[in-house]
Amino acid sequence: MDDYFSAEEEACYYSSDQDSLDGIDNEESELQPLSSKRSNTQVITQESLLAAQREDLLRVMELLSIKEHHARTLLIHYQWDVEKLFAVFVEKGKDSLFSGAGVTVFDYQYGNSSFPQSSQMSCDVCMEDLPGDHMTRMDCGHCFCNNCWTEHFTVQINEGQSKRIRCMAHQCNAICDEDIVRSLVSKKRPDLAAKFDRYLLESYIEDNRMVKWCPSTPHCGNAIRAEDDKLCEVECSCGLQFCFSCLCQAHSPCSCLMWELWRKKCRDESETINWITVHTKLCPKCYKPVEKNGGCNLVRCICGQCFCWLCGGATGSDHTYRSIAGHSCGRYQDDKEKQMERAKRDLNRYTHYHHRYKAHTDSSKLEDKLRDTIHEKVSKSEKRELKLKDFSWVTNGLDRLFRSRRVLSYSYAFAYYMFGEEMFKDEMTPEEREIKKNLFEDQQQQLESNVEKLSQFLEEPFDEFSNDKVMAIRIQIINLSVAVDTLCKKMYECIENDLLGSLQLGIHNISPYRSKGIEQAAQFYASWNSKDADKFQPLDSGTSGVTSRPEQASGSRSSEDTICSSSQKRPKKEGSFLNNKVTLLDLNLPADFVDQN
């Protein structure tokens, strides 16, 4: 076994059946917390979305003794971070908390928003005298006719201001009561009231830094809440595994920026990409493409970084038309041989890393097809009269193989950018780059060698072996499983501490390694009592909508391009609430079509 275990891993060997009895489970228990511990990520379904939002609203309403729309405004301002909101309240007080979020709460609250029909009142907007029952008063005391209020609400909702509709009185910053908005709008525009409700509900996801939509295609309708750290990889209940930070497929040990660049580089080049490559250069700070539209060689990116167009090096802003203060670079020379040599070297380097990346990706796909075959072998072995009855070591080894293949595959994309001459050219000297590259490649090769050995042993026809041979292959698979897990952990530690940790520009971070694989998000369960639900009014208020069920994300583990999303966008569906359940409406359809359905 010395040919595929390093000396450091010899302590992990199991040389007998008794030693290896629970080798994998014991090793994993040291690396991971107990399964009984509460998951750090939760799945918020359409049914639990309202409960999740109400749980946070209720906590703020009870602590500050305010109405629901005021609590919602505060939570949106603080990105639905209840703990941060409470911390500001304790440190700075209620007045500072409210003023910072733009919330106006009046000491005197008018008890009734409506007036008797017998009274005659004048609206200061349309200047008409109307019966009292045609007028409505907000908490701030400003009173206008229902038609003017409705028009004001309609404009605000259509302009995307549903979450912060303010009073239309001059210089009044009070937030309008959601119940009044819903009641008035639903009488004339039920579809708009449903849209209003949907925006309020989805603000919990779109304005919440701890919650994001699952990027599955077609959309599964779920959202994921990561309570501790957004730098994690998570598995939705629909089966999709993705990076919570960038919403692309799980890609550690690559950073999000590295994976975005690698994904674009591997994609078939279109005319647009060719044009961008020819006419733009990457900013040395944020790495976004910048186009030069004339003028001198000093270029300023939208992030504020100035750089030289000729060499791409970061510079200051002081310059003349012909020179940049404190900066000099080799002028452009038409040296065709050097250009061709560098282009050839870059191409060969990319080809090498892409070939290894693709090889492990393809191997993982082939091994995934063998899963059923291996399970059949396990089933046959369990029916045989063998001393060994438990074959969980096979499935554990298979799971370990898939995880380590994924790590190996993405490690080549990481190495391409980490040890290239573009991304970190100012962070490392050539000598430092070579030393770190050798350190990383040593660990990468050890992991690769052990993974290939594990794959070979799992493909053995152990269902046809004798007792002694089954015991022997069992020890081999358990030892290799423990070894590749240890090597994966060491590779992550090397990347986090020795490679990325030594960089001055800390924009590259990776999700931590998990011995048991990507964490599957648990179902969300509201901790608020059912009696607390009486404090909230139903959000339908007579609105109607088309009931539909979102499609499940069948095949959501397909190509990387189908699940990648550049921003935290809401699915293009709208809805209301019927019987306290979310129903969906398509806002792209005409209102009359929706009403007919």
Curated annotation (Swiss-Prot):
Expressing tissues: Ubiquitous.
Residues that bind Zn(2+) 3: C214, C220, C236, C238
Entries under Pfam families matching the protein: Ariadne, IBR, UBA_ARI1
Biased amino acid composition, Polar residues: 540-568
Annotated region described as Disordered, given as residue ranges: 536-575
Keywords per UniProt: Metal-binding, Repeat, Transferase, Ubl conjugation pathway, Zinc, Zinc-finger
Residues the entry annotates as binding Zn(2+) 1: C123, C126, C145, C148
Cofactor note: Binds 4 Zn(2+) ions per subunit.
Single GO BP term: protein ubiquitination
Ranges annotated as RING-type zinc finger: 123-172, 283-311
Binding-site residues, Zn(2+) 5: C283, C286, C301, C303
Domain notes: Members of the RBR family are atypical E3 ligases. They interact with the E2 conjugating enzyme UBE2L3 and function like HECT-type E3 enzymes: they bind E2s via the first RING-type zinc finger, but require an obligate trans-thiolation step during the ubiquitin transfer, requiring a conserved active site Cys residue in the second RING-type zinc finger. The active site probably forms a thioester intermediate with ubiquitin taken from the active-site cysteine of the E2 before ultimately transferring it to a Lys residue on the substrate.
PANTHER family membership: RBR FAMILY RING FINGER AND IBR DOMAIN-CONTAINING
Protein name: Probable E3 ubiquitin-protein ligase ARI1
Organism this protein belongs to: Arabidopsis thaliana (Mouse-ear cress)
Lineage of source species: Eukaryota, Viridiplantae, Streptophyta, Embryophyta, Tracheophyta
